[in-house]
């Protein structure tokens, strides 16, 4: 469930545009742009309404992964020379896919944006914005506030909801799955709700109330995937809409965040490594904003508020990892910050939640999850180690000062609810049916020694009763960019694979964020090759410890994860049998040299500036997948790209695919008759964008590819898919 209490850290650090949803939905540590950072989400059964027949939006919990961003036109389909023909008869995969696509949509669980405010719950029902009494939120007794079809968009869905403090207005951001463009509608609440106004291309937005009891909406405007302008608007008899702030540095973006107690609205001006925050008084929004601390290169900070004190999560000072500091709200400058709490070394701060008497930190340390509960009255700290099966948090809305609810999940286990009760000082877990996967599978935390001696964590899943793991298929997952954790949310198809005997391995290589800020720093710019060395070490370690073998090893990556995946295919193709890539970033050099692209300047801190720095240019040439394709044997590759993806270089994907096929053809000629060429498939999906949900068609196509390339029997896996995907 969502309301104005938001994911604190994710709303800020992980709203960076490269995540795939700047100022729109999000993916979390770096999550989906479905405002998974910007709003709190709960699983809710979606009820179709009679008023509209458009299918509702299905979204994934942690989809927001950093990404390149582009527009691409005049795309020509790629001739799939090496693609194996499908059998004439419809096989098990096709039957499953067909059944999934024709199944009534309401049979599936939907991630639905909800906001609880006052005595009401606001949410999307079918294609309508509705509200119902809190106690009636799970039945069909609701009031329709706005029909999304009035906007005449194709399959619209609500991305974010904000309710004005006195519930005179509600603002909703509406998008379609084919575009990242959004429309923010303002609905005046009355006996007959009406749309008061609408604004295009809104990213983040928040309500405050001024001294005259008038509702004021602050919002950011997105142009060419960048958010540089902040506006404020009023409605009713005193309508006004004015630009309030413009960020002139193109390498920064702007994001709004309302502190949990609604006392301050923060204007967050950020890039990948540096931030600056201004405070707007929630009681006097027309007063000039107050600067907390002018931007200092390399210093990140995020702000919460409680009882006239600011709590600042920052990397300032040594060590350069996040620490919690505190200062009086009327003396916010950095020289007044006092150290309040420090993290252990190699600890990742996933989120922070502020309560009346407690501050709760959600952490990852040594590849395990923890919750630290800090008593603000006595500075006491209670550290709770969470179950070892858990790999990810899903934050829940919380307006109750006595409880802190959240969910835990893993790639093969559906989310489970937990609640920390402050009065008892204990963590309570949801009771009921125990997931059988806990008894039929194992989760292992392993480490691989990289080329320079650095230990790289891995998370491995396999069936408990599996015998001779060396003969089992292995699916490697990698990302390693932007300081983002490898996505480990629940995926039904991953569970099906484990049930069918697969080994899943998640390699937390440098460049990601699993071990904190330094882990990211050691895998960006002129240290990108560390991530590649880590990935190679992980795969070799798994093989050496008896997990699968190269002929049964596959690799999957999304977006910027395609850099390491593509680089490995160039330098060590013998480690892999098949690779699946989704919206992959494959041409780093040409992309970063094109400063006309909307986000290139914001990406310089991650990849470097090859246009002005010869050192960066030469270094990128060493690992860039496109630049290093050569005539040799490659694993089979399945690439999924999206026709309307604004954030990934689609032309670059096409060029990469053609160049790869040419290299394979040249190698085949040199090798001679009898050479078995790998299967190279480019699947360009119509519509969609970089943050579109996983479709059943895509899932079945990718699994089909893996099974066929490894020569495995797919009969049982599709029966299980039918069960887990609910038809």
Swiss-Prot record:
One of the protein's GO biological processes: proteolysis
Gene Ontology CC terms: cytoskeleton; cytosol; Golgi apparatus; nucleus
Xref: InterPro entries: AB_hydrolase_fold, Pept_S9A_N, Peptidase_S9_cat, Peptidase_S9A, Serine_Peptidase_S9A
Superkingdom as given in the UniProt entry: Eukaryota
GO MF annotation list: peptidase activity; serine-type endopeptidase activity
Keywords for this protein: Cytoplasm, Cytoskeleton, Golgi apparatus, Hydrolase, Nucleus, Protease, Serine protease
Pfam family, one: Peptidase_S9
Leading EC class: hydrolase
Cellular compartment(s): Cytoplasm, Cytosol; Golgi apparatus, trans-Golgi network; Cytoplasm, Cytoskeleton; Golgi apparatus
Enzyme active site: 559 (charge relay system), 645 (charge relay system), 690 (charge relay system)
EC id: 3.4.21.-
Function: Serine peptidase whose precise substrate specificity remains unclear. Does not cleave peptides after a arginine or lysine residue. Regulates trans-Golgi network morphology and sorting by regulating the membrane binding of the AP-1 complex. May play a role in the regulation of synaptic vesicle exocytosis.
Subunit structure: Homodimer. Interacts with the AP-1 complex.
Family: Belongs to the peptidase S9A family.
Name by which UniProt lists this protein: Prolyl endopeptidase-like
Organism in which the protein naturally occurs: Macaca fascicularis (Crab-eating macaque)
Lineage: Eukaryota, Metazoa, Chordata, Craniata, Vertebrata
Gene: PREPL
């Amino acid at each position: 469930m969502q309301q104005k209490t938001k994911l604190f850290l994710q709303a800020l650090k992980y709203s960076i545009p490269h995540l795939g949803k700047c100022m729109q939905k999000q993916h979390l540590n770096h999550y989906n742009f479905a405002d998974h950072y910007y709003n709190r989400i709960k699983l809710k059964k979606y009820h179709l309404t009679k008023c509209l027949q458009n299918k509702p939006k299905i979204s994934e919990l942690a989809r927001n992964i950093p990404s390149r961003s582009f527009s691409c036109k005049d795309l020509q389909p790629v001739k799939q020379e090496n693609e194996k023909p499908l059998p004439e008869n419809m096989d098990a995969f096709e039957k499953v896919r067909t059944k999934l696509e024709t199944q009534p949509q309401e049979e599936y669980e939907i991630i639905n944006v909800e906001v609880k405010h006052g005595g009401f719950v606001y949410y999307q029902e079918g294609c309508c914005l509705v509200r119902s009494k809190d106690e009636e939120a799970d039945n069909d007794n609701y009031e329709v506030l706005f029909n999304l079809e009035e906007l005449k968009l194709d399959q619209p869905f609500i991305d974010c909801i904000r309710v004005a403090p006195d519930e005179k207005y509600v603002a909703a951001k509406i998008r379609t799955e084919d575009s990242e463009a959004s429309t923010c509608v303002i609905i005046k609440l009355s006996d007959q709700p009406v749309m008061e106004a609408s604004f295009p291309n809104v990213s983040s937005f928040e309500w405050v109330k001024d001294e005259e009891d008038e509702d004021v909406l602050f919002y950011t405007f997105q142009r060419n995937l960048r958010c540089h302008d902040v506006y404020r608007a009023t409605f009713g008899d005193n309508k006004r809409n004015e630009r309030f702030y413009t960020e002139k540095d193109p390498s920064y973006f702007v994001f709004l965040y309302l502190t949990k107690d609604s006392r301050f609205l923060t204007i967050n001006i950020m890039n990948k490594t540096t931030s600056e925050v201004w405070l707007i008084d929630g009681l006097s929004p027309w007063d000039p904003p107050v600067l907390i601390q002018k931007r200092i290169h390399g210093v990140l900070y995020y702000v919460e508020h409680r009882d006239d004190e600011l709590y600042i999560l920052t990397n300032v000072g040594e060590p350069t990892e996040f620490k919690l500091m505190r200062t009086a709200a009327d003396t916010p400058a950095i020289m007044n910050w006092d150290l309040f709490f420090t993290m252990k070394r190699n600890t990742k701060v996933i989120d922070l939640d502020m309560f009346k008497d407690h501050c709760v930190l959600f952490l990852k340390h040594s590849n395990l999850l923890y919750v630290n509960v800090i008593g603000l009255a006595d500075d006491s700290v209670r550290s709770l180690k969470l179950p070892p099966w858990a790999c990810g948090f899903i934050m829940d809305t919380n307006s109750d000062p006595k409880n802190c609810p959240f969910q835990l999940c893993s790639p093969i286990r559906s989310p489970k609810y937990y609640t920390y009760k402050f009065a008892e000082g204990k963590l309570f877990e949801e009771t009921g049916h125990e997931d059988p996967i806990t008894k039929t599978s194992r989760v292992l935390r392993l480490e691989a020694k990289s080329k320079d001696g650095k230990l790289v964590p891995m998370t491995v899943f396999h069936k408990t009763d599996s015998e001779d793991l060396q003969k089992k298929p292995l699916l490697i997952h990698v990302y390693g960019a932007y300081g983002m954790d490898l996505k480990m949310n629940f995926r039904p198809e991953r569970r099906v694979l484990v049930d069918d005997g697969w080994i899943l391995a998640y390699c937390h290589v440098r460049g990601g964020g699993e071990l904190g800020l330094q882990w990211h720093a050691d895998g960006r710019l002129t240290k990108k090759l560390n991530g590649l060395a880590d990935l190679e070490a992980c795969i070799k370690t798994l093989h050496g410890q008896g997990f699968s073998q190269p002929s049964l090893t596959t690799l999957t990556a999304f977006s910027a994860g395609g850099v390491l995946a593509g680089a490995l295919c160039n330098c060590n193709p013998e480690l892999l049998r098949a690779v699946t890539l989704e919206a992959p970033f494959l041409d780093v050099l040409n992309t970063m040299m094109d400063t006309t692209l909307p986000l290139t300047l914001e990406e310089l801190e991650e990849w470097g500036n090859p246009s002005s720095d010869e050192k960066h240019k030469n270094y990128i040439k060493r690992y860039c997948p496109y630049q290093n394709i050569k005539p040799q044997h490659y694993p089979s590759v399945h690439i999924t790209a999206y026709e309307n993806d604004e954030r990934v270089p689609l032309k670059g994907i096409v060029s990469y695919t053609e160049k790869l096929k040419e290299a394979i053809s040249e190698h085949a000629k040199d090798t001679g008759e009898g050479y078995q060429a790998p299967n190279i498939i480019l699947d360009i999906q119509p519509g969609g964008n970089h943050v579109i949900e996983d479709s059943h068609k895509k899932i079945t196509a990718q699994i089909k590819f893996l099974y066929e390339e490894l020569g495995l029997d797919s009969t049982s896996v599709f029966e299980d898919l039918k069960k887990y995907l609910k038809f």
